[in-house]
Design a protein with these regions (language model features):
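Active-site activation/catalytic loop segments of kinase-like enzymes and analogous catalytic loops
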Residues: 106, 112-149, 165-187
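All-alpha amphipathic helical-bundle segments outside canonical DNA-binding/catalytic cores
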Residues: 149-165
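Generic recognition of stable, solvent-exposed alpha-helical segments in well-folded globular domains
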Residues: 1, 39, 80, 85, ...
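ATP/Mg2+ or Mg2+-diphosphate-binding catalytic cores
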Residues: 167-223
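ATP-dependent phospho-/nucleotidyl transfer catalytic cores
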Residues: 1-82, 94, 200, 210-211, ...
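Catalytic activation segment of kinase domains across protein kinase-like and atypical kinase folds
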Residues: 86-122
Length: 223
């Protein structure tokens, strides 16, 4: 509900296209961002690769080989997303609806459903995610619809969600190499990369590199 409350008000708002400093989906921004993450990858795999399961390392290698295609194909600038939506960045009050989101340094304009994929993929144990993922994403989709997002079908929402699984992979690679290295940080990033890559593997999300471009994504509008 909180993610939908963030994403729905500015969903497919044309004014967002003028916020170039937030839009990472333009060709220039996509090329620059993917190049930066790719340049950090050798150091990341040197530090964390030996501790990864073979199937996770293989999935990571395959995903990194297509990072440029992923950024170029991010579904159109649909809404404002937090970019790092995880439990560390949530303050929980006494009531079930008392939730505050903090740490907005990664806010961008783009595929809002990536926030949902990042949250579910990174915060839940893989076995818990697999058991509840469909229900959680359907709840998120319905919450968007209830808040006025029209024309975003369930199938399109799920497609964008699968695309968003790679958001966590690439963010993890970049963040791990850009922040000060600590024992706690290394443990967190090794857990994160394992969960996010397994998420992409579980959903067989390798076809998304060829699936999206701005000419083929139907825009979701607010009713």
């Amino acid at each position: 509900d909180q993610a939908a409350a963030l994403h729905a008000p500015r969903w497919n708002d044309p004014a967002l296209r003028h916020l170039s400093w937030l839009d990472r989906t333009t060709p220039a921004a996509a090329a620059a961002t993917s190049a930066i993450v790719a340049s950090l990858y050798p150091g990341f795999v040197e530090r964390f690769g030996p501790g990864l399961a073979p199937e996770v390392l293989d999935g990571l290698e395959r995903g990194m080989a297509r990072i440029g295609d992923w950024w170029r194909g991010v579904p159109g600038a649909a809404t404002v997303l937090h970019g790092d939506l995880r439990l560390d960045n949530l303050l929980l009050g006494e009531g079930s609806d008392d939730i505050w989101t903090v740490d907005w340094q990664t806010v961008v304009v783009g595929n809002g459903v990536a926030d949902a994929a990042y949250f579910v993929g990174g915060n839940l144990l893989p076995e818990v995610r697999r058991a509840h993922e469909d229900d959680l994403v359907r709840h998120y989709h319905q919450a968007l619809v209830d808040r006025g997002v029209a024309d975003l079908t369930w199938d399109e929402c799920w497609a964008r969600y699968r695309h968003g699984t790679w958001h966590g992979v690439y963010l993890c690679v970049a963040a791990a190499m850009l922040v000060e290295q600590t024992e706690r940080g290394d443990l967190m990033f090794s857990t994160d990369i394992d969960r996010h890559v397994r998420h992409a593997l579980d959903l067989d999300a390798f076809d998304v590199f060829d699936r999206f471009d701005e000419s083929t994504i139907p825009g979701a509008s607010r009713g």
